[in-house]
Amino acid sequence: MARAFLFVLDSFGIGGAADAERYGDAGANTLAHIAEACAEGRADRERLRQGPLFVPHMASLGLGKAAETATGLGFAHFGTDLIANAFHGAAQEVSSGKDTPSGHWEIAGLPVRFDWGYFPDTVPAFPADLTAAMIREGEVPGILGNCHAPGTEIIERFGEEHIRTGKPICYTSVDSVLQIAAHEVHFGLDRLYEFCQVVRRLVDPLRIGRVIARPFVGETAATFQRTYNRHDYAVPPPEPTLLDRLTARGSRVIAVGKIGDIFAHRGISEVRKAAGNMAMFDKALGAMDDAGDGDLVFANFVDFDTEFGHRRDVAGYAAALEAFDRRLPEAFARLRQGDLLILTADHGNDPTWRGTDHTRERIPVIGMGPGLAGGDIGLRTTFADIGETVAEHLGLAPGRHGTSFHAMIGGHA
């Protein structure tokens, strides 16, 4: 049997989504706009990075070719030399959302065919009966925020009042989410998690995808900083995913980063977390070392999204891509005959785009494996093709959604 490694660069879209206009995202392209900014010197930052976007290892897997597949336009920012056993293509999402659970579930073979619940962009954003229940059942003196807002901004705005009053900061966005920020010391981390579990139960009837604990530290608006003790409380997938199918067979699924939270810990054998992309990469490499035949390592690199996409930090996003790319040879070196490595994304978050929210984009599907023929897998009509390919590679029977491209890259289950 073989092994599979699925690395999700959270929010690393490549434009071209056929339905982008419906979301107000026509023209959004995370990769292309970062590359353009770098080429024009607009992403230079002293002691961080300079010059054109330099990601030679992802380019050698066909990232530029994937970008051309996504948009139908040329992509001149990378060279065209590809390694022999690499494959490249792009995928269009069929799930209605442009959020983290929808993207990851679809990657794992389960498109989201229902509509998530959302909160309106009003003040207050939450229904009065929900707010009352949160206060009563969560045993808090009230809540702050109750609106749409970027996370760092709302902590700056309400953090000091939160410390004085003990009221948690509750907010939302265009995603199906209710986020709760609280101070790790003054409110307490365990208390925040307990409050989020109460809220998770209360919003279940509203089909809200995630309740997210957003702890922070600091004593003033100028010093507040979110920590890496974030925890997502997600709705469980409504039917088995690739992860469930693997663990039911007896294979291990090692979740790196927030993968366990995204799947409500369904189909997960082990969770490995760390703070920051580079520490997460260390965890992914360790999981690769420990994976046995038939196992899947599923890793999410969240900083691209939370630290740079939402914050519209082009230089930071570019530097993070370059740092990630520099580590890829360490992953390549761990691949053995019969292994499959796929790099992809779950949605876009163009740091040059208006607002602070995700962008509807196609995603790259690039990768390699010793013994594979590689090649062009074209435009996949659903992210679920990724999950089906991993399933076939690991010897599972076909699932209900998606079409494997395993044969196209010369794979043999």
Curated annotation (Swiss-Prot):
It is an enzyme of class 5 (isomerase). It is found in: Cytoplasm. Pathway: Carbohydrate degradation; 2-deoxy-D-ribose 1-phosphate degradation; D-glyceraldehyde 3-phosphate and acetaldehyde from 2-deoxy-alpha-D-ribose 1-phosphate: step 1/2. Keywords: Cytoplasm, Isomerase, Manganese, Metal-binding. The keyword Cytoplasm applies. GO terms for cellular component: cytosol. One of its GO terms (molecular function) is phosphopentomutase activity. The keyword rRNA processing does not apply. Binds 2 manganese ions. Its cofactor is Mn(2+). Isomerase that catalyzes the conversion of deoxy-ribose 1-phosphate (dRib-1-P) and ribose 1-phosphate (Rib-1-P) to deoxy-ribose 5-phosphate (dRib-5-P) and ribose 5-phosphate (Rib-5-P), respectively. Mn(2+) 2 binds at D305, H310, H358. It comes from the Bacteria. InterPro entries: Alkaline_phosphatase_core_sf, DeoB, Metalloenzyme, Phosphopentomutase_DeoB_cap_sf. Its main location: cytoplasm. One of its GO terms (biological process) is 2-deoxyribose 1-phosphate catabolic process. Mn(2+) 1 binds at D10, D346, H347. Its EC number is 5.4.2.7. This is Phosphopentomutase. It catalyses: 2-deoxy-alpha-D-ribose 1-phosphate = 2-deoxy-D-ribose 5-phosphate; alpha-D-ribose 1-phosphate = D-ribose 5-phosphate. Belongs to the phosphopentomutase family.
